[in-house]
Amino acid sequence: MDKNIFHLVGMPRAGNTLLGGIINQNPNLQVSPLSPLSRVVSALHLSFEGESWENFDWTSEQDTLARKTAQAWYSDYKTKSIIDRGTWYPEVVKRLSDNPKVIILQRDIFEVFASFIKWANGNVENFIYTNVTSRKPEDVMAYLSQYGNVQTSARMIYTYQKYLEENNDIDVMYIDYKDLTGDTENIINNLYDFLEVDKFDHNFDNIKDFEFEGQKYNDTKVGSNLHKLKEGSIETSTHDIEWLFPRNLYNRWINMNELIYTPEQLEEKYNKWKY
């Protein structure tokens, strides 16, 4: 039987591991770690481009190959439904299902940077300070933007914003980090409704570390505890943004939130900013 394959994109440090830690309590619905599947399917998608193939319509074959590849990837997994986390572009996602669904995790850009910095300060051996020896916020932010998947993730979210302005063939659910951590049970219930799969009685007070098909994250290459979940009840991590980031840095990076959030979301959540 074919799996239900959904898609997860969004910002780093925005609750990806937490979402997986919760959902993966359900044996019939699992969230993957950051997966190469999106890259594999995207490569197949690109192989149909070029002048050599333009004199024949290969659309049906393209869709069939993409779907069969995704199904083959997870064919040996026991779960019925999978939320695959990856760099899923809309043009690829729409070929994998008659009713494609994408979950987009959002978090304020300064909260993302602050979360990385807090983690790095608490774990001396880490990929950030190994490459940014100055440890200055401006240098850390520039590095993470390029190598920490920050800018790529923000632009991915913006790609969906622009796509949905002109298309309605992909269903999207936005989840903000503050909502996921502050209103967890309600968000998870809404997620089940969005995915149209049977709900599960989750334990929100004792969430174990992320595990997928019996494997846990090996963070030795990036730094200890990058994907470590806090024990006990779920809490929203907060940071003193004004203390961490001087005004000049704030002004330099504030516009990236326009990639992460829709104009309506910005107006509602951050109405102090004018656009």
Where are these regions (language model features)?
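Hydrophobic/aromatic beta-strand patches that form the interior of the parallel beta-sheet core
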Residues: 6, 30, 101-103, 173-175
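Glycine-rich phosphate-binding loop used to anchor ATP phosphates in small-molecule kinases
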Residues: 69-95
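PAPS-dependent sulfotransferase catalytic domain
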Residues: 70, 114-194
